[in-house]
C-alpha cells in the first residue's frame, strides 16, 4: 500500500478542487496513483451539482464571437484552472456562446435556464461548480474581437475603420483596461469622486485651497484621459494617443466591452495547514 502523503493530497486538491477527505479516499482507492485517482473521481457520479452549488466559481473562460454586424462576449466560470482547460467544459461554453449569438440573447438568466440541465450534468461529471456568469453584445459597422488566452476577451465596435485597426484597438483595450470611450464619457459621479480624492491629497501637502483647486483641475484632465480609450497612449505606438490614431484613419470607436475571468469575485483562500490539522483530529 503506497503512502498517502499530505503533499499528494494537496496536489490532488489543487488539480480537482475536491474536498480533502474526498481526495484522500480517492488516493487510497488508487493506491497513491494521482492520475488514476483523478480519472476515478471524474468517472464517479458521487460528486453532485447540489454539493458544489455553494462553491466559489472564480476561474473559467471568456468567449467571443462575431457574426456579421453582431458580436457576443460571454463568461462561464468554474472553480479551477484545471477544469477551465477541460474539453467538456470548453465545449459547454462554446455551445452557450453559439446559442447567445444565434438567438441574440443578452439576458444571462435566459441562458442559464436554457442550459441548466446540461450544466448540472457537467457539474456531476467534472466535480466543480459551473456558472454562466454574464453575457453582453455589440452591434456596429465594423466589429473586432481579441482574446488574451481564455482569461481576457474584448469586443470593439467602430466606424470608418478596417478590420486590422479594430483588432489592434481590441488588443489595446485588453492591455490598458480603459473604462470609457472618450474623456467626455466619464460620468459626473466618477469625476466628482476623483476630484474630492485629489483635492484632499493636494490640501494635505499644505497648499492653500485656491492653489490646491487649480492643481486638481489639471490632474482631473489627466485622470479622464487615463481612464478613457481615446485619451490613452496607444500600446503599439505610445508616442501617439488612441484618439490621434483614430483621427489619422478618419475612424471612430462607438463602444467596447472588456471581460476578464473572475472580475469582482472574491476567491476563498484555504489554510491548508489548518485543514490538515483539523483532518488529523477527526481521524
Curated annotation (Swiss-Prot):
Give yes or no: UniProt keyword Cytoplasm. Answer: yes
Question: SUPFAM superfamilies attached here?
Answer: Elongation factor Ts (EF-Ts), dimerisation domain (SSF54713), UBA-like (SSF46934)
Matches recorded under Pfam families: EF_TS
Q: Please give the superkingdom of this protein's source.
A: Bacteria
The protein's UniProt keywords, in alphabetical order, are: Cytoplasm, Elongation factor, Protein biosynthesis
**Localization:** Cytoplasm
Q: Name one GO molecular function term.
A: translation elongation factor activity
Where are the stretches annotated Involved in Mg(2+) ion dislocation from EF-Tu?
A: 80-83
Provide the Gene Ontology terms for cellular component. cytoplasm
* Family classification: Belongs to the EF-Ts family.
Name the HAMAP family on file. Answer: EF_Ts
Tell me, what does this protein do in biology? Associates with the EF-Tu.GDP complex and induces the exchange of GDP to GTP. It remains bound to the aminoacyl-tRNA.EF-Tu.GTP complex up to the GTP hydrolysis stage on the ribosome.
Name listed for the protein in its UniProt record: Elongation factor Ts
Question: Origin organism of this chain?
Answer: Pectobacterium atrosepticum (strain SCRI 1043 / ATCC BAA-672) (Erwinia carotovora subsp. atroseptica)
Amino acid at each position: 500500500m503506497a503512502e498517502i502523503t499530505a503533499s499528494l493530497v494537496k496536489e490532488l486538491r489543487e488539480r480537482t478542487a475536491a474536498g480533502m477527505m474526498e481526495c484522500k479516499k480517492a488516493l487510497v482507492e488508487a493506491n497513491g496513483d494521482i492520475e488514476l485517482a483523478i480519472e476515478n473521481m471524474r468517472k464517479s457520479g458521487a460528486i453532485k451539482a447540489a454539493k458544489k452549488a455553494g462553491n466559489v466559481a472564480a476561474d473559467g473562460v471568456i468567449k467571443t464571437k462575431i457574426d456579421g454586424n453582431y458580436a457576443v462576449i460571454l463568461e462561464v466560470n468554474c472553480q479551477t484552472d484545471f477544469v477551465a482547460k477541460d474539453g467538456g467544459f470548453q465545449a459547454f461554453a462554446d455551445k452557450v456562446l453559439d446559442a447567445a449569438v444565434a438567438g441574440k440573447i443578452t439576458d444571462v438568466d435566459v441562458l442559464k435556464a436554457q442550459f441548466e440541465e446540461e450544466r448540472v450534468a457537467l457539474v456531476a461529471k467534472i466535480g466543480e461548480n459551473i456558472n454562466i456568469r454574464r453575457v453582453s453584445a455589440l452591434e456596429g459597422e465594423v466589429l473586432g474581437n481579441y482574446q488574451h488566452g481564455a482569461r481576457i476577451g474584448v469586443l470593439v465596435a467602430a466606424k470608418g475603420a478596417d478590420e486590422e485597426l479594430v483588432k489592434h484597438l481590441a488588443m489595446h483595450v485588453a492591455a490598458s483596461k480603459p473604462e470609457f470611450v472618450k474623456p467626455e464619457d466619464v460620468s459626473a459621479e466618477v469625476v466628482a469622486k476623483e476630484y474630492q480624492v485629489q483635492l484632499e491629497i493636494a490640501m494635505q501637502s499644505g497648499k492653500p485651497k485656491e492653489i490646491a483647486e487649480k492643481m486638481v483641475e489639471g490632474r482631473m484632465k489627466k485622470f479622464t484621459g487615463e481612464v478613457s480609450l481615446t485619451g490613452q497612449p496607444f500600446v503599439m505606438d505610445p508616442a501617439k494617443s488612441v484618439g490621434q490614431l483614430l483621427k489619422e484613419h478618419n475612424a471612430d470607436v462607438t463602444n467596447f466591452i472588456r471581460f476578464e475571468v473572475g472580475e469582482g469575485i472574491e476567491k476563498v483562500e484555504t489554510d491548508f495547514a489548518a485543514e490538515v490539522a483539523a483532518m488529523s483530529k477527526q481521524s
